[in-house]
């Protein structure tokens, strides 16, 4: 039997290119340098004597040969993942409990689709969200009131394992008729005379406060709301400005309710991590949920970046 050239890693690379539309972003997704990924693609093209995508296209446009390999990857990858799940069930069983605690008001936008996909493969795992917003989800883990937590910072605790989910950009939003809509980039001083609409959380959990305003001694007037849609309504009505994840703002940007602007020249970026108890490290369904959340997030949320520990 003639040996095949294509390997599983090639298919992962091609899917990353398809989903990100960029060589640099795809390289980060599969944990390669950009030159290593380009070399991998070059070897595939040389093997078959065909280009896989059009050079200098943005986003990448795949050739017919490239699209054929993408179809192959879409067929093979789910089967490999299913086989790995089956083996995990044989080893560890397929029942358990997975209670999720979050410290992020916008997490539900991407968490629910991941939970739905997970249920299809782990029907005997009791899946639930610990009700309410939590300022100490790690404490819930350690007290056995939660089994999986989403946090924005890593704590040093030998009893907890942290795994990177992704990094994302926070953008400033305001009414289309607001004076700040004329600025491409907002700096700390732009918030001085504004009403800042936030979620009702402690200051140290607000990225804009921690990373931009606090060091400048700027503390604008506040207004709080639990709901993102209520925040959008206040901003659209010129009763304040806000900072939220780009993915959370996008549906309202597309409808023209508000406009989004970059916060500082460097941008305002935040991170999210998954946390589990050290004693639960071997539970296969927890690892599969982690992989499902990452996969769903990068597939559906715009503007994410790979995050490393």
Swiss-Prot record:
It is found in: Cytoplasm. One of its GO terms (biological process) is methionine biosynthetic process. Keywords: Activator, Amino-acid biosynthesis, Cytoplasm, DNA-binding, Methionine biosynthesis, Repressor, Transcription, Transcription regulation. GO terms for molecular function: DNA-binding transcription factor activity; transcription cis-regulatory region binding. InterPro entries: LysR_subst-bd, MetR_PBP2, Tscrpt_reg_HTH_LysR, WH-like_DNA-bd_sf, WH_DNA-bd_sf. It comes from the Bacteria. The keyword Transmembrane helix does not apply. GO terms for cellular component: cytoplasm. Residues 6-63 form the HTH lysR-type domain. Disulfide bonds: none annotated. PROSITE patterns: HTH_LYSR (PS50931). Pfam families: HTH_1, LysR_substrate. Residues 23-42 bind DNA. Control of the last step in methionine biosynthesis; MetR is a positive activator of the metA, metE and metH genes. Belongs to the LysR transcriptional regulatory family. PANTHER family: HTH-TYPE TRANSCRIPTIONAL REGULATOR (PTHR30126), HTH-TYPE TRANSCRIPTIONAL REGULATOR METR (PTHR30126:SF25). This is HTH-type transcriptional regulator MetR. It comes from Haemophilus influenzae (strain ATCC 51907 / DSM 11121 / KW20 / Rd). The lineage of its organism: Bacteria, Pseudomonadati, Pseudomonadota, Gammaproteobacteria, Pasteurellales.
């Amino acid at each position: 039997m003639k040996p095949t050239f294509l390997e599983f890693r090639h298919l992962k690379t091609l899917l990353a290119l398809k989903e990100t539309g960029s060589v640099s972003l795809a390289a980060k997704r599969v944990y390669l340098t950009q030159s290593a990924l380009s070399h991998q693609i070059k070897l595939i093209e040389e093997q078959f004597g065909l280009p896989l995508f059009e050079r200098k296209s943005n986003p990448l446009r795949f050739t017919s040969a490239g699209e054929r390999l993408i179809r192959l990857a879409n067929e093979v990858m789910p089967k490999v993942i299913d086989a790995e799940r089956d083996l995990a069930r044989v080893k560890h069983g397929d029942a358990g409990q997975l209670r999720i605690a979050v410290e992020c008001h916008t997490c539900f936008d991407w968490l629910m689709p991941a939970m739905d996909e997970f249920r299809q493969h782990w029907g005997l795992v009791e899946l639930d969200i610990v009700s309410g917003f939590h300022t100490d989800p790690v404490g819930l883990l350690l007290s056995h009131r939660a089994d999986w937590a989403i946090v924005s910072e890593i704590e040093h605790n030998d009893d907890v394992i942290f795994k990177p989910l992704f990094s994302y950009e926070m953008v400033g939003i305001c009414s289309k008729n607001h004076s700040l809509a004329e600025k491409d980039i907002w700096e700390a001083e732009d918030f001085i005379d504004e009403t800042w609409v936030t979620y009702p959380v402690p200051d140290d959990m607000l990225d804009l406060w921690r990373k931009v305003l606090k060091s400048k001694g700027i503390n604008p007037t506040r207004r709080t709301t639990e709901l993102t849609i209520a925040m959008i309504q206040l901003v659209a009505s010129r009763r304040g400005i806000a900072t939220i994840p780009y993915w959370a703002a996008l549906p309202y940007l597309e409808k023209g309710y508000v406009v989004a602007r970059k916060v500082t020249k460097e941008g305002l970026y935040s991170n999210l991590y998954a946390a589990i108890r050290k004693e639960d490290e071997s539970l296969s369904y927890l690892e599969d949920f982690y992989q499902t959340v990452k996969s769903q997030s990068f597939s559906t949320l715009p503007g994410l970046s790979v995050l490393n520990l």
